[in-house]
């Protein structure tokens, strides 16, 4: 299964998804975070498609979408509903669309439901945990606050060991001035409790290491909204993963590369410039 949650607030739109796949016939899918797949596919700056359920059906749907001459919302909805129905409704879809207004379309149970506020698909237990983490922490209707609480609640679901079908990486697609794009961010999980007092100006961040159980990742996005892709660099381990669904549905690995080298190799191999924040010695540098 998986969990995908979409939300619209005052013209903004975001869709959060995990990357875990849980095919019981593939042992590695249960054991490795890197065996996951990108669950939210940005087709162009106006449309993204997310899925939950049967992976094979979802991959077939993505293949068929890329055969379309033009990504029009009517054709995208019709194609996904047809594939959903033909495969016994085993795979649900969530479409984020920027039309005259931001809209979320949910394809499930042989029908399409549209909302201008909220939709979700996937694991009901995961969604219930999301709601449990979201509502008690919602203190205002400020869009930035709502987005932060939403993101933190989704992180809690991924981190929980009670939801077996949800896990892996937390991928976000959101609205920017250029349309729907992947969110670039830095994630740092300390192996032990650390207290940091930051002074004004430049600060050195104690990254820790593998021995202390620290896990860090730098999420980088394509700078071209018409070539949507997302890369994740792991400073502790010096490797990167690229998700570029138009070219390859699976994760693309780059070993023994620092953040700069990872970005350079992606540009050389696929003509994509990925941007975001990377570790540069003891500092963070935007590329």
Give residue ranges: language-model regions:
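N-terminal nucleophile
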Residues: 1-287
